[in-house]
């Protein structure tokens, strides 16, 4: 069944929401895309297709810059403003019931962390959190992850050049409220080698199980 597409006005222009509703929802999960991809990223689509049967309505928000056909994302403040407006508007919909969780892939996870408290989220799902640019570990974004102020689930590939699980663990230290899950052999896009012992099917199952438990549990 195709997602329902909704237009959402924001201070940064119109964005789009792709809604996959649960029949008897207990939670709402709003997900954002990365700077280099859209709402059709494999992991975002996986969650949108499979979580509703667990009672979780999934909404994938397309930022206005991408809706407008631009290739480059705007500054973080503009992303946060558009996201906050969209999530706030969505919460007013009659089908948006249950506890609110936010999250996203890569840059979308950063936005979700920065705005979690402002939108009243119960938790944040981080898919491939970009701790730093490849080869630039000194430019850490750990403060965004650590400062979310709500429980966080971080799913990170062991071969992610934007930050390995070990790097994220080091940045976390003993900070409470963060569950870090390593995806063996996966890169930033959650791709694994065909011959890997931890297969693509294993990865999808792990992602679904972890997010389903975090949001629906």
Where are these regions (language model features)?
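Serine-hydrolase catalytic machinery in alpha/beta-hydrolase-like enzymes
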Residues: 5-99, 187-198
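Short alpha-helix in the alpha/beta-hydrolase fold that links the catalytic acid
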Residues: 44, 138-141, 150, 163-172
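The conserved SAM/SAH-binding core of class I Rossmann-like methyltransferase domains
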Residues: 61, 127, 155
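Acidic catalytic loop of the alpha/beta-hydrolase fold
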Residues: 158-162, 188-189
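Catalytic active-site module of serine/aspartate enzymes centered on a nucleophile-bearing elbow/loop
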Residues: 194-217
């Amino acid at each position: 069944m195709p997602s329902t597409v909704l237009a959402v006005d924001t201070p940064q222009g119109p964005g789009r929401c792709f809604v996959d509703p649960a029949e008897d929802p207990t939670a709402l999960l709003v997900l954002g895309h990365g700077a280099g991809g859209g709402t059709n990223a494999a992991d975002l689509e996986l969650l949108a297709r499979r979580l509703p049967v667990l009672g979780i309505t999934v909404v994938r928000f397309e930022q206005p810059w991408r809706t407008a056909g631009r290739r480059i994302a705007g500054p973080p403040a503009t992303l946060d403003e558009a996201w906050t407006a969209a999530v706030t508007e969505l919460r007013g919909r009659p089908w948006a019931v249950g506890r609110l969780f936010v999250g996203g892939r890569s840059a979308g996870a950063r936005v979700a962390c920065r705005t979690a408290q402002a939108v009243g989220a119960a938790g944040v799902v981080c898919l491939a959190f970009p701790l730093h640019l490849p080869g630039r570990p000194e430019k850490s974004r750990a403060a965004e992850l650590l400062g979310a102020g709500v429980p966080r689930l971080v799913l990170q590939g062991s071969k992610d050049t934007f930050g390995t699980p070990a790097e994220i663990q080091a940045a976390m230290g003993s900070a409470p409220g963060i569950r870090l899950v390593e995806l063996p052999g996966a890169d930033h896009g959650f791709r694994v080698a065909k011959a890997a012992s931890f297969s693509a099917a294993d990865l999808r199952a792990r992602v679904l199980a972890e997010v389903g438990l975090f949001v629906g549990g």
